[in-house]
Amino acid sequence: MAALRVALVGIGKIAVDQHVPALRGSADWELACTVSRKGTVDGVQAFADMASMLEARPDVQVVSLALPPMPRFVAAEAALKSGRHVLLEKPPGATLAEVHALQALAAERGLTLFATWHSRMAHAVFPAKAWLADKTITRAHITWREDVRKWHPGQDWVFEPGGMGVFDPGINALSILTEILPAAVHLQSAELEFPANRQTPIAARLAFSGNVTADFDWRQEGPQTWDIEVETTAGRLDLRMGGNVLEIDGQPAGGQNTIMGEYPALYARMAKLIAAGQSDVDLAPMVHVADALTLGRRVIVDDFFF
């Protein structure tokens, strides 16, 4: 089968670090062009806006959106209306309603819409889900602590309305949680820490039904922590390295100590969805974030500056 031609929109850090290597490493894909106000990729045709690209490149079959959440709906809608399949970087939108609208539009046009959760593609997530499938969960806890200055250097949009703040990484943990637990949980309470000079939280503590809790923090320097621990009546499971390393009862049980397999797996999944004429839009992780911002008790903390 001929490679699918894709336009990559939003050439920032995540596009350069993850999307471009994944596309260039796959026979399923051809990075046909990019769209970005500033960023470019060497050797690839570049456009400054979506309208110009859509008009000039009718041969592009797929649009992959690595834009921040706020401008993503307009770009996704334009791509779908022009007959292109669409891949959405996480989170899939700034609001739940706009993603539902995109889902309806894709279905109406017979196009594939893939709302991606890259952390679900981590090496140990599937075996963790399989191990937990017949277990009785007694407790689960997420510790997701990283350094915003490392992962979003100078990117003030993450602290603007719609940027999600610490839920930008935290939603990755929630995407794993909602994938591996054998039964659904719902949020019961939350405490959110907002820097006095910012619009979104820099830390969050969440409590769910089923004795499930989470601790998110964007101020951790040095080694980063992306762990999920699950206790059951039959033993303990730990996911480390963002879902890439699995331990059962404290012993290594699979996975790989790298995050570089997630995006190749996303694009492989997208190619299969297009071939099958299907879409994949699961908003469960985003529902938990929306609930946290609805239920959360606000705590003001020190100003934050990059």
PLM feature spans:
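C-terminal helix-rich "cap/oligomerization" subdomain common to oxidoreductases
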Residues: M1, S52, V62-L65, R269-F306
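Hydrophobic residues in well-ordered beta-strands that form the structural core
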Residues: L88-E89, L113-A115, L239
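Rossmann-like dinucleotide-binding domain that binds NAD(P)(H)
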Residues: P153-T225, V287-H288
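N-terminal Rossmann-like dinucleotide-binding module
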Residues: M1-D42, F306
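Receiver (REC) domain switch-region micro-motif
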Residues: V63, A140, V212
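NAD(P)-dinucleotide binding in Rossmann-like oxidoreductases
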Residues: F194-Q199, S209-K272, Q278-L283
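A contiguous active-site-proximal alpha/beta segment in oxidoreductase catalytic domains
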Residues: G93-W151
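Beta-loop-alpha module in the N-terminal Rossmann-like domain of NAD(P)-dependent dehydrogenases
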Residues: V44-Q103
